[in-house]
């Protein structure tokens, strides 16, 4: 078992990334911007929707086309009167051009507006994906740091219990303690070994989670500088104020509002199917032909034909089998759907924003409590070990105090990371999160040794 554990820990400490990667949060985020599939898909969708604008605009512009044709042939004919065969050769050349343009198609202008609004909505979705990436990268990064901290604490706890186990065995050998104390210490040591294995595996899991986002394995990531770490009450300092900020700036909410505009214009576009349309058209066609025959009864000729036309076409829809009315009803139902989506998004934004604010405030208090808990646990362990030396405390008391100390350290470590994550979640809900937040957090890291 010791050999297996050593192999696992060695793999953790000596693993190298498949691709070279910088080891701080900012570099990991930049790598994620280039490789995260969610962001790249949102970017691609935005590019797709932008082209809809060009396609919708194109039908409003003149449509010009040109044609050309050439044919060459030969015809043989037999005359029973003259008992002779004659041959006629002919060829023709034709070309033309046409210009068509919509003078009035109300639905075409509405479709252009819908395309613009849809592209704007897609752009907002892309921005949302990038905001979410900040949160996801930071969460994955600090989950990995937390796993590494847990391994350090597990190894330190195991080492402390190993010393206590050895001390208990020595005391038992000279008759100063009972065999039950040895068993208690051995059981705690075995638990510590199990926790070390679990912590080591958690690092592998966290590395894989980060790799999914960045497409490279992390290596020697920078740690949180606990000496410089400090907490700050969110500004503004009330849940109501953050709710107002979110209602004005949250991109999910803004996206849903644009969806309402798109749905309304879709109704107008469907109704435009009842409107008349007016089109302009102009065309020119020319053809030249030549016929040459050896039959004296047939004359060779060189016909030329030119054709010009220009005009407007008015189309007034009278009855389309109910298709237009159906399209209007469908668009109206889609508007109801978009309205409900906006309402649900607003409720979710209010809930997540207020919860995020309260969570940040609670986490700040939690950090202060865990800092005091670590100090108290350290003093308690010292006192318990001193009592054990003089016989007033048992090895069970020492083991419990040891476990309490490292539990407090784990809780403090994880709560610090949770504070950073909760602040980002609050800013994400409030619509104020930016790349600068990554830079600010990165400045609070220290290069891994």
Protein language model regions, located:
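Gram-negative bacterial Sec-dependent N-terminal signal peptides
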Residues: 1-22
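Bacterial Sec-pathway N-terminal export signals of envelope proteins
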Residues: 20-69, 75, 218, 224-261, ...
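Small/polar, glycine/serine/threonine/aspartate-rich low-complexity segments that form flexible
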Residues: 67-101, 227-235, 268, 281-316, ...
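Periplasmic alpha-helical coiled-coil/stalk elements that build and connect Gram-negative outer-membrane
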Residues: 132-247, 359, 363, 404-405, ...
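Acidic, low-complexity, intrinsically disordered peripheral segments
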Residues: 411-449
């Amino acid at each position: 078992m010791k050999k297996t554990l050593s192999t696992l820990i060695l793999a953790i400490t000596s693993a190298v990334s498949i691709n070279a990667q910088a080891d701080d949060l900012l570099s990991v985020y930049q790598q994620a911007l280039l490789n995260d599939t969610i962001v790249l898909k949102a970017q691609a969708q935005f590019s797709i929707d932008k082209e809809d604008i060009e396609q919708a605009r194109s039908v409003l512009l003149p449509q010009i086309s040109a044609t050309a044709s050439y044919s060459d042939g030969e015809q043989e004919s037999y005359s029973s009167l003259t008992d002779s065969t004659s041959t006629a050769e002919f060829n023709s050349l034709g070309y033309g051009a046409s210009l068509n343009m919509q003078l009035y198609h109300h639905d075409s202008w509405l479709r252009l507006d819908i395309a613009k609004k849809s592209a704007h909505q897609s752009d907002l979705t892309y921005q949302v994906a990038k905001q979410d990436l900040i949160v996801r990268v930071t969460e994955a990064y600090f989950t990995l740091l937390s796993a590494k901290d847990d391994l350090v604490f597990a190894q330190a706890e195991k080492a402390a219990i190993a010393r206590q186990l050895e001390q208990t065995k020595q005391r038992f050998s000279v008759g100063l303690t009972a065999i039950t104390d040895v068993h208690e210490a051995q059981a705690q040591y075995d638990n510590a070994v199990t926790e070390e294995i679990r912590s080591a595996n958690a690092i592998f899991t966290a590395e894989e989670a980060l790799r999914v986002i960045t497409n490279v394995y992390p290596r020697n990531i920078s740690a949180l500088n606990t000496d410089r770490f400090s907490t700050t009450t969110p500004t503004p300092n009330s849940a109501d104020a953050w709710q107002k900020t979110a209602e004005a700036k949250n991109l999910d909410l803004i996206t849903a509002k644009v969806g309402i505009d798109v749905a309304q214009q879709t109704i107008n576009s469907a109704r435009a199917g009842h409107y008349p349309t007016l089109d302009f058209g102009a065309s020119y066609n020319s053809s030249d032909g030549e016929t040459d025959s050896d039959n004296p009864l047939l004359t060779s000729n060189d016909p030329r034909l030119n054709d010009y036309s220009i005009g407007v076409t008015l189309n007034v829809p009278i009855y389309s089998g109910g298709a237009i009315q159906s399209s209007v009803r469908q668009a109206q139902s889609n508007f109801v759907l978009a309205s409900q989506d906006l309402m649900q998004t607003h409720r979710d934004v209010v809930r997540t924003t207020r919860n995020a604010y309260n969570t940040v405030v609670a986490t700040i208090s939690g950090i202060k409590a865990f800092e005091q808990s670590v100090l108290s646990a350290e003093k308690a362990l010292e006192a318990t070990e001193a009592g054990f030396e003089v016989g007033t405390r048992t090895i069970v008391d020492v083991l419990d105090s040891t476990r309490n100390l490292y539990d407090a350290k784990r809780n403090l470590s994880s709560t610090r990371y949770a504070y950073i994550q909760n602040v980002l979640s609050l800013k994400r809900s409030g619509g104020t999160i930016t790349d600068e937040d990554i830079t600010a957090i990165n400045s609070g890291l220290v290069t891994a040794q």
